[in-house]
Swiss-Prot record:
Heterododecamer (2C3:3R2) of six catalytic PyrB chains organized as two trimers (C3), and six regulatory PyrI chains organized as three dimers (R2). GO terms for cellular component: cytosol. One of its GO terms (biological process) is amino acid metabolic process. GO terms for molecular function: amino acid binding; aspartate carbamoyltransferase activity. InterPro entries: Asp/Orn_carbamoyltranf_P-bd, Asp/Orn_carbamoylTrfase, Asp/Orn_carbamoylTrfase_sf, Asp_carbamoyltransf, Asp_carbamoyltransf_Asp/Orn-bd. Pathway: Pyrimidine metabolism; UMP biosynthesis via de novo pathway; (S)-dihydroorotate from bicarbonate: step 2/3. It comes from Nostoc sp. (strain PCC 7120 / SAG 25.82 / UTEX 2576). It catalyses: carbamoyl phosphate + L-aspartate = N-carbamoyl-L-aspartate + phosphate + H(+). Carbamoyl phosphate binds at R61, T62, R111, H144, Q147, G289, P290. Pfam families: OTCace, OTCace_N. Its EC number is 2.1.3.2. Belongs to the aspartate/ornithine carbamoyltransferase superfamily. ATCase family. This is Aspartate carbamoyltransferase catalytic subunit. NCBIfam families: asp_carb_tr, PRK00856.1.
């Protein structure tokens, strides 16, 4: 496995990922994808290590994917649920993390509704001088690094299954459509796609895509010229697009009525076969899930393997999360 140039102890964000790190993840994931195609889908890479999945927010795909990834690497797993934990009795997040540390945890996979929680736990582990890695499984509206990486792997593997790599997306047009304002997935995908040299076109109603969004993402820096575009109509984003990523409307994060109705949203921004006629003939559609059928994407299109990569994303997720756990855990054995 290509770990010789991997020096990252935690995976908290894709904002500072290098091209070399992206390629290491892609190549390692491809190796594990091959493992998952075997009859015996297990390797002893992390045997004896403990992976704790600390999910303070509901999750189906990400939590199950990380648990399966850890088990495929022969790690022992601990699964945390906030509703049945001592947090209901007043225990703090950091004290919960320290409890799992005392049990001998090697890797903590953290999801929380508030941005910055995985980073705070990583800083505390570093302050304590312990060799515990933290992997961000989604923090508020901040980032979702493993989802961004699995989306990247899904696309690159489609283009070149034998050798998925970052440069394959150079010059490709990627449309990201939907609730971009509240989406941590969009933020991670923007970082990875910009790094690849792709053209990223964001499309959403103005209430879900403020004009200052690029400044919000990049801070004092500016997006590379000719790589990030903002549209308040769908058609310009879809025109000649190679891939379309559609995002769930996160109604649970909306503090106001940002849309007239779901029906109107689907008419204007929902992805359908008819709208895909604006794209490249071999366009593919992605969605991080869970999907609101008939809102972000038509039900028939979601189930059509000619266009939809949604199930491939789920499959890719296990291999990519195996790669991340292996890369940050391989130095602990």
């Amino acid at each position: 496995m290509p770990t010789s140039t991997w020096n990252r102890h935690h995976v908290l964000s894709l904002a500072d990922f290098t091209a070399a790190e992206y390629d290491i993840v892609l190549k390692t994931a491809a190796s594990f994808q091959e493992v998952l195609s075997r009859r015996t889908k297990k390797v002893p890479a992390l045997q004896g290590q403990v992976v704790a999945n600390l999910f303070f927010e509901p999750s189906t795909r990400t939590r199950s994917s990380f648990e399966l990834a850890a088990k495929r690497l022969s790690a022992d797993t601990l699964n945390f649920a906030a509703s049945t934990s001592s947090m209901t009795k007043g225990e703090t997040i950091l004290d919960t993390a320290k409890t799992y540390l005392a049990m001998g945890t090697d890797i903590m996979v953290i999801r929380h509704k508030e941005a910055g929680v995985p980073n705070a736990i990583a800083q505390e582990m570093d302050r304590l001088g312990v060799r515990v890695s933290v992997l961000n499984a989604g923090d508020g509206q901040h980032e979702h690094p493993s989802q961004g990486l699995l989306d990247l792997f899904t696309i690159c593997s489609l283009i070149d299954p034998a050798n998925p790599r970052l440069e394959l997306l150079q010059g490709k047009k990627i449309a990201i459509v939907g609730d971009i304002l509240h989406s941590r997935v969009a933020r991670s995908n923007i970082w990875s796609l910009i790094a690849s040299g792709a053209q990223v076109h964001l499309a959403a109603p103005p209430t879900l895509l403020p004009k200052f969004f690029a400044e919000y993402i990049f801070g004092e820096e500016t997006a590379p010229p000719g790589q990030l575009f903002i549209h308040w109509q769908l058609e310009p984003a879809l025109q000649e697009a190679d891939f379309v990523m559609t995002l769930r409307l996160q109604k649970e994060r909306m503090t106001a009525n940002l849309l007239p109705s779901l029906r109107e949203y689907h008419q204007l921004f929902g992805i359908t076969r008819a709208k895909l006629q604006l794209c490249q003939p071999n366009v593919k559609v992605l969605h991080p899930g869970p999907v609101n059928r008939g809102v972000e994407i038509s039900s028939d299109l979601m189930d059509d393997p000619e266009f939809s990569l949604i199930q491939s994303q789920v499959t890719s997720g296990v291999a990519v999360r195996m790669a991340l756990l292996y890369l940050i855990g391989s130095g602990k054995t």
